[in-house]
Amino acid sequence: MSKAYEQSGVNIHAGYEAVERMSSHVKRTMRKEVIGGLGGFGATFDLSQLNMTAPVLVSGTDGVGTKLKLAIDYGKHDSIGIDAVAMCVNDILTTGAEPLYFLDYIATNKVVPEVIEQIVKGISDACVETNTALIGGETAEMGEMYHEGEYDVAGFAVGAVEKDDYVDGSEVKEGQVVIGLASSGIHSNGYSLVRKLINESGIDLASNFDNRPFIDVFLEPTKLYVKPVLALKKEVSIKAMNHITGGGFYENIPRALPAGYAARIDTTSFPTPKIFDWLQQQGNIETNEMYNIFNMGIGYTVIVDEKDAPRALKILAEQNVEAYQIGHIVKNESTAIELLGV
């Protein structure tokens, strides 16, 4: 190939090296249902091997947002890929779907093979943990679109659930219990505000906060809920689920509730990670608003019948997940969420 393409700002040799570096990580994620290998124009997956009677495909796409800016600024690229996978698979999990495969999209000013490898390693680690095949992706070098050193990461996940097992919130009733699964921290939402508060505070991100460097706290990857929730679903009838992302409690919990019902949440029933206290104090933010921005320590919720709540908590504990009975379902025609203690 002529040098014209390279002179326009695209280094195809760096692209080849990045592909070579990521190949071993991608291969770790393969499932038996994947047909063919890497490098084709389209990735293929054999649904017939799932042994499902009436599979419904569920898809979701998301990115990591401005959390990427922190990772880029401090040269920590190994966990951002986990965030990209978690944001997608946790979303489709709310329908009861088992994630099957994932595709990534990385766009950058300049392909740096070592950085791309770190990102894809994180993606692959999350895919292995959730038994999700990384069957395809795209790495785009676009020097005119991004500043030097910058990149963006997004993903697309597809899962499947038996049609009769699809969870859509239609069976939610008064008296059912809301169980909250602990988050690992901020996860991947609210980072425009987080970065603003970091800049205003003037803190050294290498300094310690709660026995860890600030930067590690801020870049803690989003928790993956796939394994524990699928284990729970095998044993307990789940009526609705929510992934607590952008918009916090106020925007996410109502998404799975039928009209005329509300989730009454006791905010004193679960611990709030200290980093949220720091953010609230630094920004002088009202508590009510914090629950409209952040997950506040609960990254995922499931709604079950009251009689099943103790068993559900036991199963989640066996899956090494911190979980709490944080509320219950009530009748309410005017609002879909009631927060007590704010």
Swiss-Prot record:
Keywords: ATP-binding, Cytoplasm, Ligase, Nucleotide-binding, Purine biosynthesis. The keyword Ligase applies. It is an enzyme of class 6 (ligase). It comes from the Bacteria. It is found in: Cytoplasm. GO terms for biological process: 'de novo' IMP biosynthetic process; adenine biosynthetic process. It catalyses: 2-formamido-N(1)-(5-O-phospho-beta-D-ribosyl)acetamidine + ATP = 5-amino-1-(5-phospho-beta-D-ribosyl)imidazole + ADP + phosphate + H(+). Belongs to the AIR synthase family. This is Phosphoribosylformylglycinamidine cyclo-ligase. It comes from Staphylococcus aureus (strain MRSA252). The gene is purM.
